[in-house]
UniProtKB/Swiss-Prot annotation:
<comment type="subunit">
    <text>Homohexamer. The oligomerization is ATP-dependent.</text>
</comment>
<dbReference type="GO" id="GO:0005737">
    <property type="term" value="C:cytoplasm"/>
</dbReference>
<dbReference type="InterPro" id="IPR041546">
    <property type="entry name" value="ClpA/ClpB_AAA_lid"/>
</dbReference>
<keyword id="KW-0067">ATP-binding</keyword>
<feature type="region of interest" description="NBD1">
    <location>
        <begin position="161"/>
        <end position="342"/>
    </location>
</feature>
<dbReference type="InterPro" id="IPR017730">
    <property type="entry name" value="Chaperonin_ClpB"/>
</dbReference>
<keyword id="KW-0677">Repeat</keyword>
<feature type="binding site">
    <location>
        <begin position="208"/>
        <end position="215"/>
    </location>
    <ligand>
        <name>ATP 1</name>
    </ligand>
</feature>
<comment type="similarity">
    <text>Belongs to the ClpA/ClpB family.</text>
</comment>
<feature type="region of interest" description="Repeat 2">
    <location>
        <begin position="85"/>
        <end position="148"/>
    </location>
</feature>
<feature type="binding site">
    <location>
        <begin position="611"/>
        <end position="618"/>
    </location>
    <ligand>
        <name>ATP 2</name>
    </ligand>
</feature>
<dbReference type="InterPro" id="IPR036628">
    <property type="entry name" value="Clp_N_dom_sf"/>
</dbReference>
<dbReference type="Pfam" id="PF10431">
    <property type="entry name" value="ClpB_D2-small"/>
</dbReference>
<keyword id="KW-0175">Coiled coil</keyword>
<dbReference type="InterPro" id="IPR027417">
    <property type="entry name" value="P-loop_NTPase"/>
</dbReference>
<feature type="region of interest" description="Repeat 1">
    <location>
        <begin position="9"/>
        <end position="73"/>
    </location>
</feature>
<feature type="region of interest" description="NBD2">
    <location>
        <begin position="561"/>
        <end position="772"/>
    </location>
</feature>
Length: 874
């Protein structure tokens, strides 16, 4: 038979024949023989290698044998490089064609070629003798792989063992102990088993939010099947998870995807109920593989699902179920819904306790029970956009990974010594070049110090290595215990009770004793205070990871921070002058929050700041942001003058569907989603349209708002500050007259009620009235402003000295009770900053000078005083 017609062969078989030419040319052979074809088949992973592997043959050994055989054949060098079909290959192809007819196939496939080799009188005979391969064995393997399928197209290899290619056997993974234990979820698993036991429409679909444990329910069912903890109708069944991505990937031509899916479904139906399919993200089935004029996967599944021929478990989220499956009513009625709710905090703690051992073995650290409780409780409170138990498991996992990283990194004490040694060695090199007596004495002292440090370094290094080795040994023992427990379970399943008892009371007991000894030794090192490494995850680690994720300071208060919090009002007073009531109210709110006593279902605090312009309303918000986040930029500032139209509310929470900017989200909601812990300043609220405040009712009361895309944005860790100038004329009327304070307060409150609705005002924690500023307070503000100017001057190596008269002069011309401190800022800019700038440009001041400012003839005068250069100490 001449292999000139590719239409007689499948794609893979023809590719192998084409490669045969290259193999022969590389070996400098003029005739293509059967050995060249065999080597070409070995070089391409696929069906040929799979058949030979199942026959117990190693690909590497086969390749070596074939290459040695080819190397022994006579070579032809020079002349024409064309190759001809050899007699052995011609006969082999004829034999393959005969096998094709025997099998009832339409094309010569790879399996026909492989099956022909034992009948090859040239290379095949030697191969059979060397590796004990016979035709009968190969035929059985091919029948097993092909099942009842015939070669009816040119790509049949893609349809063989389709489930093995495109699925994962969950029951096999459960048998090998590869699945995590599933704790709880008994009701959902029971309902799934109940639906699977039906005669028709026996297809449960698990519906729930992402991360609540839908896939875990399928894994739990696989574990129950292995343990025999299922009804008779599910005994010895195989649960296979279908990988839709692998099924679609690489399907280049129309109809190729459908062929693959049909092959999978055929294997499932041929198993006569033994195989149960699990399709994670089942919504991907709807529309999968659909191109013009071809069917999608959902339509291929429908007939089998309805008749009960195919038992399938699906899993998808609520949104995707609504979006894809509910639209297809015919597909929806074939599935029975099983709702999977988010577990409670208590259930999550139980789940974490069940998984704890797996994570301890993986990371090689211990996880305290307090850490598990903290992960469940804190993730519920602070991570609102994800679901339990997923977010709590992630916290424990990342905390353990972080601690493992610390164990393998160099301890701080050792790192410090290493740096010091490096520094001293550099100093020693420098001193060795000096010959004077002082340098020689210093060198001797340095040598002694270096020797002591190196000794300490050796001691600490060996201690660190020893501790690291103990922790690694503990991990190895835990892994061994894990393996022994798995063997015990397998022995109990097989009713091999002698083996189970031998392992449980022999090997397992010995390993447990060994583990207890090692952990006891490590605990003694820790309690003695000599330990360099920490190997237990605590609640502090969990809190630190939450802080990293969200920016919310959840970690326990250390002594220095407690002191800082107690002095918070004093710190704020240094920046905001003359507003004791406002500063105290804000400081109290922060102290309540950090002590953990604020209401977890509302924002940390919400204030309305009322007062005339320039008295420190916005400045207090900036000071607070600077204290909490070390930068004023962390404040989310919303200028309400931009929200004067009714429709502008969409800018806060996002444009509704169908409008331009829908995908961008809202200015407020997106900022808070990215930074859940922040100070939000709504400046000049009286300028905004009244309807804008309807959005704020939920924020102030429940600490949450739903944006235009239906996502709940959490405001529970924010401080809301709203500023307004309403009633400022009444505040100015009583400036400095404390006896009329109550009268002024009631008039300001009336003005506020006239402008805002009661349901809005009633939700704000506190309305604070800022007083107009007095002259003596302006003096303090001048000093603050001058301090900032001094910081800017220090960049030019200049310092500033102001006489008391100069400060009084600035206050006098900058004082205006109506406009507050802002005119003062302009006066400093005009009278002081501009004059200094001009003097610098004229060259009046040089580096290191002190600028002395005094008053003469009702104007500021400047004098340069040279600062003496510092004499270095010998």
């Amino acid at each position: 038979m001449q292999p000139t017609n590719p239409n007689q062969f499948t794609e893979k078989a023809w590719e192998a024949i084409v490669r045969t030419t290259d193999v022969a040319k590389q070996a400098q052979h003029q005739q293509i023989e059967s050995e060249h074809l065999f080597l070409a088949l070995l070089q391409e992973p696929g069906l040929a290698l799979n058949i030979l592997k199942k026959a117990g043959l190693e690909a590497a050994q086969l390749q070596q044998f074939t290459e040695r055989f080819i190397a022994r054949q006579p070579k032809v060098s020079g002349g024409n490089q064309s190759v001809y079909l050899g007699r052995s290959l011609d006969q082999l192809l004829d034999q393959a064609d005969q096998f094709r007819k025997d099998f009832g196939d339409e094309f010569i496939s790879v399996e026909h070629l492989i099956l022909s080799f034992p009948r090859d009188s040239r290379f095949g005979r030697l191969l059979s003798q060397e590796f004990k391969v016979d035709e009968k064995q190969l035929r059985q393997i091919i029948q097993q792989i092909r099942g009842s399928q015939k070669v009816t197209d040119q790509n049949p290899e893609g349809k063989y063992e389709a489930l093995e290619k495109y699925g994962r056997d969950l029951t096999e993974m459960a048998r090998r102990g590869k699945l995590d234990p599933v704790i709880g979820r008994d009701d959902e698993i029971r309902r799934t088993i109940q639906i699977l036991s039906r005669r028709t429409k026996n297809n449960p679909v698990l519906i729930g939010e992402p991360g609540v444990g839908k896939t875990a329910i399928a894994e739990g069912l696989a574990q129950r099947i292995i343990n025999g903890d299922v009804p008779q109708s599910l005994k010895d069944r195989r649960l296979i998870a279908l990988d839709m991505g692998a099924l679609i990937a690489g399907a280049k031509f129309r109809g190729e995807f459908e062929e693959r899916l049909k092959a999978v479904l055929k294997e499932v139906t041929d198993s006569e109920g033994i195989i149960i399919l699990f399709i994670d993200e089942i919504h991907t089935v709807v529309g999968a593989g659909a191109v013009q004029g071809s069917m999608d996967a959902g339509n291929l599944l429908k007939p089998m699902l309805a008749r009960g021929e195919l038992r399938c478990i699906g899993a998808t989220t609520l949104d995707e179920y609504r979006q894809y499956i509910e639209k297809d009513a015919a597909l929806e009625r074939r599935f029975q819904q099983v709702f999977v709710d988010q577990p409670t905090v208590e259930d999550t703690i139980s789940i974490l306790r069940g998984l704890k051992e797996r994570y301890e073995v993986h990371h090689g650290v211990r996880i305290s029970d307090n850490a598990l409780v903290a992960a469940a409780v804190l993730s519920t409170r602070y991570i609102s956009d994800r679901f339990l138990p997923d977010k709590a498991i992630d916290l424990v996992d990342e905390s353990a990974a972080r601690l493992k990283m610390e164990i393998t990194s160099k301890p701080e004490e050792l790192d410090e010594i290493d740096r010091k040694i490096l520094q001293l060695e550099m100093e020693r090199l420098s001193l060795q070049k000096e010959s004077d007596l002082a340098s020689q004495e210093r060198l001797q002292r340095l040598e002694k110090e270096l020797a002591d440090l190196k000794e300490e370094q050796r001691s600490l290094s060996s201690q660190w290595q020893a501790e690291k080795d103990v922790i690694t040994d503990i991990q190895s023992v835990k892994e061994e215990i894990d393996q022994v427990n798995l063997l015990i379970q397998q022995a109990e399943r097989d009713y091999d009770l002698n083996k189970a008892a031998e392992l449980k009371y022999g090997k397992l007991t010995e390993l447990q004793r060994k583990l207890n000894e090692m952990e006891g030794g490590l605990a003694t090192t820790h309690t003695s205070g000599k330990s360099l490494l920490r190997e237990e995850v605590t609640e502090v680690d969990i809190a630190e990871i939450i802080s990293k994720w969200t920016g919310i300071p959840v970690s326990k208060l250390v002594e220095s921070e407690m002191q800082k919090l107690l002095n918070l009002d004093e710190e704020l007073h240094q920046r905001v002058i003359g507003q004791e009531e406002a500063v105290s109210a804000v400081a109290d709110a922060i102290q309540r929050s950090r002590a953990g006593l604020s209401d977890p279902k509302r924002p940390i605090a919400s204030f309305i700041f009322l007062g005339p312009t320039g008295v420190g309303k916005t400045e207090l918000a900036k000071a607070l942001a600077a204290y909490l986040f070390d930068t004023e930029d962390a404040m989310i500032r919303i200028d309400m003058s931009e929200y004067m139209e009714k429709h502008a509310v969409s800018r806060l929470i996002g444009a509704p569907p169908g409008y331009v900017g829908y995908d961008e989200g809202g200015q407020l909601t997106e900022a808070v989603r990215r930074r859940p812990y922040s100070v939000i300043l709504f400046d000049e609220i009286e300028k905004a349209h009244p309807d804008v405040f309807n959005v704020m009712l939920q924020i102030l009361d429940d600490g949450r708002v739903t944006d235009s895309r239906g996502r709940t944005v959490d405001f529970k860790n924010t401080i809301l500050i709203l500023t307004s100038n309403i009633g400022s004329q009444y505040i100015l009327d009583v400036a400095g007259d404390d006896s009329r304070y109550e009268e002024m307060r009631s008039r300001v409150t009336e003005a506020l009620r006239a402008n805002f609705r009661p349901e809005f005002l009633n939700r704000v924690d506190e309305t604070i009235i800022f007083h107009s500023l007095r002259k003596d307070q302006l003096q303090q503000i001048v000093r603050i402003q001058l301090h900032r100017l001094e910081e800017r001057l220090s960049d030019r190596k200049l310092s500033l000295s102001m006489s008391p008269e100069a400060i009084d002069f600035l206050v006098e011309i900058g004082f205006d009770p109506v406009y507050g401190a802002r005119p003062l800022k302009r006066v400093i800019q005009r009278e002081l900053e501009t004059a200094i700038a001009k003097a610098i440009l004229r060259g009046q001041f040089s580096d290191g000078d002190t600028i002395q400012v005094a008053v003469e003839n009702e104007r500021l005068v400047f004098k340069a005083i040279a600062t003496p250069t510092a004499v270095p100490l010998s």
